[in-house]
Curated annotation (Swiss-Prot):
Similarity field: Belongs to the argininosuccinate synthase family. Type 2 subfamily.
Subunit organization: Homotetramer.
GO cellular component: a single term: cytoplasm
A single GO molecular function term of this UniProt record: protein homodimerization activity
Pathway involvement of the protein, from the record: Amino-acid biosynthesis; L-arginine biosynthesis; L-arginine from L-ornithine and carbamoyl phosphate: step 2/3
Protein name, UniProt field: Argininosuccinate synthase
Leading EC class: ligase
Keywords: Amino-acid biosynthesis, Arginine biosynthesis, ATP-binding, Cytoplasm, Ligase, Nucleotide-binding
Organism whose genome encodes this protein: Neisseria meningitidis serogroup A / serotype 4A (strain DSM 15465 / Z2491)
Positions annotated to bind ATP: 20-28, 46, 132, 134, 139, 197
Catalyzed reaction equations: L-citrulline + L-aspartate + ATP = 2-(N(omega)-L-arginino)succinate + AMP + diphosphate + H(+)
Record keyword Disulfide bond present: no
Binding residues annotated for L-citrulline, in chain numbering: 102, 138, 142, 195, 204, 206, 283
C-alpha cells in the first residue's frame, strides 16, 4: 500500500478495514467480498433514529454472520439532535423553493456519522474506512472531509471505486447472487421507484424515477408522515404549542422534554400527522451539477416555524437580516461537508450567542394539511413587538408625536436630493432614460 495515497483503489489485503454497515444488499455483499478476498472487515452501524429501521440490534449480528471481525452499533441520536438544534438556531438552510426550505437533514446526518464512526474506528485501531457513497454524489466528499478531520491518518477504501469489485459485483442482481452462492439466503427486496435515505431529522427521496421532473411528489410514499396530497387521507386541524428557552426547544404542548431525542421524535409525530415539512427541491450538488430531491422533515419544520416567529418578534431588522445572510452561507457550508470548519464555527457561534440566546417564549400554531398552517399566538418576555407604539387609536404617553415624524421626514430630504442628482447623472450618460416610456416615467428630465 502506498502510504502517500489517501484513497486506496485496491483492497488492502490482510489489513483492518472499517465499513459503515447498514445491513442492506450493498454493504452486506461488500463486507463478505472483502472478507473472502483477504481483508479484515470491521462493521460500524450508526443509530441515527432512522424512521424506516425496525431493529438496530440485528444489524451488527448480521455483519458478524457475513464475516466481520467485529461489529459495533454506535448511538448517534443525541449528537444528531444537538446538531439539528444548532441548525435551527442558525437558520442554516440555503435550499428553498417558494419559501419552503430543505432542512439539510442529510448533511447533518453525515456530519455526525462521519465523525462518530471514524472515532469509534480509532478506538479499534482501524485506520481504513469504506462506505457506500458513489463518486457522483455529495456524500463521498462529506465523509472524506469528516473522516480526515477526525483521524488525519485515515485511508479511504471504497469497494465501489475498486474496479475488481465492480467487475465481479457490479449490480444488485450480481450482489444478490453472490450472497446466495456463499450460503446466505438473501431475498432481494422489491426495488422502489426511487431511493430513500433517512435519519431522525428527516428523509431524502431521490434518483431513479425522481430524476425526471415530470414525476412529482405523488409517487413518494412518506415514511415520516402522511401523503397530504391524497384527498382520501383525513387530516384534522391540530393546535400545537412550541416553547423555547434561550434558543433551545424544550416543550411541546406544555410538556417538557429533558431528552432532545424524545423531543424530536414527538415533534416528528405531530408534524408528520399533517405532512408538514415536505418539499420538492432542485439543488446544486457540491460538484455544481443539479439534482432533485423530495424531502421530509416534520419536526425540523415545526421548530423552524416557531423559532423564526420568535426571532422576528424579538430582534431588530439589522440583526434579522444578518441572521438570514449568515444562515444562507452556513447552510451551504453544511451542505458541502464543512459543518466543523472554522468559517462555519464562526457563523454558528455568532448566531447561537447573539440571536438564539434571546429566543425564549412560546408559539402556538394550527397545523392543517401539508405546509398549510396558521400562527395563533406568540408569547415571550423578550418581545420588542409593542403594538401601542403604532396603535391607530389615541394613546397616552405616545412613543412619538406628529411633530417628531415631520422632523424625521424632513431629514429624508437629504438623501432624496442626492438620489435625484444621481438619476440625473445616469440620464445624461445614457444609462437611464427619464420621462414617458422609461422605468421612472414621472420624474421628468429636470434635476
Amino acid at each position: 500500500m502506498n502510504q502517500n495515497h489517501t484513497i486506496l483503489q485496491n483492497l488492502p489485503v490482510g489489513q483492518k478495514v472499517g465499513i459503515a454497515f447498514s445491513g442492506g444488499l450493498d454493504t452486506s455483499a461488500a463486507l463478505l467480498w472483502m472478507k473472502l478476498k483477504g481483508a479484515l472487515p470491521y462493521a460500524y452501524t450508526a443509530n441515527l433514529g432512522q424512521p424506516d429501521e425496525d431493529d438496530y440490534n440485528a444489524i451488527p449480528k448480521k455483519a458478524m454472520e457475513y464475516g466481520a471481525e467485529n461489529a459495533r452499533l454506535i448511538d448517534c441520536r443525541a449528537q444528531l439532535a444537538h446538531e439539528g438544534i444548532a441548525a435551527i438556531q442558525c437558520g442554516a438552510f440555503h435550499v428553498s423553493t417558494g419559501g419552503i426550505a430543505y432542512f439539510n437533514t442529510t448533511p447533518l446526518g453525515r456530519a455526525v456519522t462521519g465523525t462518530m464512526l471514524v472515532s469509534a474506528m480509532k478506538e479499534d485501531d482501524v485506520n481504513i474506512w469504506g462506505d457506500g457513497s458513489t463518486y457522483k454524489g455529495n456524500d463521498i466528499e462529506r465523509f472524506y472531509r469528516y473522516g480526515l478531520l477526525t483521524n488525519p491518518a485515515l485511508k479511504i477504501y471504497k469497494p465501489w471505486l475498486d474496479q475488481q469489485f465492480i467487475d465481479e459485483l457490479g449490480g444488485r442482481h450480481e450482489m444478490s447472487e453472490f450472497l446466495i452462492a456463499n450460503g446466505f439466503n438473501y431475498k432481494m427486496s422489491v426495488e422502489k421507484a426511487y431511493s430513500t435515505d433517512s435519519n431522525m431529522l428527516g428523509a431524502t427521496h431521490e434518483a431513479k424515477d425522481l430524476e425526471f421532473l415530470n414525476s412529482g411528489i405523488k409517487i413518494v410514499k412518506p415514511i415520516m408522515g402522511i401523503a397530504f396530497w391524497d384527498e382520501n387521507v383525513e387530516i384534522k386541524p391540530e393546535e400545537v404549542s412550541v416553547r423555547f428557552e434561550e434558543g433551545v426547544p424544550v416543550a411541546l404542548n406544555g410538556k417538557e422534554y429533558a431528552d432532545p431525542v424524545e423531543l424530536f421524535l414527538e415533534a416528528n409525530r405531530i408534524g408528520g400527522r399533517h405532512g408538514l415539512g415536505m418539499s420538492d427541491q432542485i439543488e446544486n450538488r457540491i460538484i455544481e451539477a443539479k439534482s432533485r430531491g423530495i424531502y421530509e422533515a416534520p419536526g425540523m419544520a415545526l421548530f423552524h416555524i416557531a423559532y423564526e416567529r420568535l426571532v422576528t418578534g424579538i430582534h431588530n431588522e439589522d440583526t434579522i437580516e444578518q441572521y438570514r445572510i449568515n444562515g444562507l452561507r452556513l447552510g451551504r457550508l453544511l451542505y458541502q461537508g464543512r459543518w466543523f470548519d472554522s468559517q462555519a464555527l464562526m457563523l454558528r457561534e455568532t448566531a447561537q450567542r447573539w440571536v438564539a440566546k434571546a429566543i425564549t417564549g412560546e408559539v402556538t400554531l394550527e397545523l392543517r394539511r401539508g405546509n398549510d398552517y396558521s400562527i395563533l399566538n406568540t408569547e415571550s418576555p423578550n418581545l420588542t413587538y409593542q403594538p401601542e407604539r403604532l396603535s391607530m387609536e389615541k394613546v397616552e404617553d405616545a412613543a412619538f408625536t406628529p411633530l417628531d415624524r415631520i422632523g424625521q421626514l424632513t431629514m429624508r430630504n437629504l438623501d432624496i436630493t442626492d438620489t435625484r442628482a444621481k438619476l440625473g447623472i445616469y440620464s445624461q450618460s445614457g444609462l437611464l432614460a427619464l420621462g414617458e416610456g422609461s422605468v421612472l416615467p414621472q420624474l421628468g428630465n429636470k434635476q
